[in-house]
């Protein structure tokens, strides 16, 4: 799934670390990239579910539409992947304002690519998680993977687990 989406995203002119892959050798060639801070996760939400509803459930109904809502968290399992704002990321020296703006823009564009592709298969993307890094010039790029385990997808109102999603996607 990662290779499929990285190729689509690259074709759309969005920077990623993906260069090529050989499924036979199970290898992937990628550009060098540094992670932001000690690792950052960027989530784009189309529906109010998961940790979003746990945090804000008194203000919004579960499953309510969200307009490509983007949020960032530090990768830190011990602290429950705490939310972090743009201002905090800049103040802490994790990234520049321009890098944050690039990440948000790229996240919304990539999410649309993935959501549109899933929609063609009768599937609805509720949310998806990405990781970003930057090259030696400081340019933001999508890194890591785009896998079924990084997205929450539904079909006919029912959640599709990652293994089933992979099978449905390539059916």
List where the protein language model places each region.
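Short glycine-/small-residue-rich flexible loop motifs, especially phosphate/cofactor-binding loops
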Residues: 6, 86, 115
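A long amphipathic alpha-helix within ATP-dependent nucleotide-binding catalytic cores
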Residues: 95-126
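C-terminal helix-cap and adjacent tail motif
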Residues: 145-171
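Conserved metal-phosphate-binding beta-hairpin within the catalytic cores
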Residues: 44, 125-145
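ATP-dependent carboxylate/phosphate-activation module, predominantly the ATP-grasp catalytic core
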Residues: 55-102
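Active-site loop/lid in soluble adenylation, ligation, and acyl-transfer enzymes
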Residues: 1-74
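A short glycine-rich, hydrophobically flanked beta-strand micro-motif that places a catalytic Asp/Glu
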Residues: 17-22, 119-133
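Short polybasic/polar patches that bind polyanions
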Residues: 10, 90, 119
């Amino acid at each position: 799934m990662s290779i499929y989406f990285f190729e689509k995203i690259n074709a759309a002119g969005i920077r990623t670390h993906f260069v090529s892959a050989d499924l036979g050798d199970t290898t992937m060639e990628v550009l060098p990239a540094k992670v932001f801070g000690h690792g950052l996760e960027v989530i784009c939400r189309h529906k109010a579910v998961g940790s979003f509803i746990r945090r804000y459930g008194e203000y919004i109904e579960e499953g309510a539409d969200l307009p490509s809502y983007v949020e960032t968290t530090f990768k830190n399992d011990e602290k429950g992947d705490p939310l972090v704002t743009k201002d905090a990321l800049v103040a802490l020296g994790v990234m520049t304002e321009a890098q944050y703006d690039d990440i948000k823009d790229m996240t919304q564009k990539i999410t649309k690519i993935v959501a549109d592709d899933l929609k063609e298969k009768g599937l609805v993307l509720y949310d998806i998680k990405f990781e970003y890094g930057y090259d030696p010039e400081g340019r933001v790029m999508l890194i890591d993977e785009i896998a079924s385990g990084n997205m929450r997808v539904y079909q006919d109102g029912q959640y599709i687990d990652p293994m089933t999603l992979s099978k449905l996607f390539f059916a």
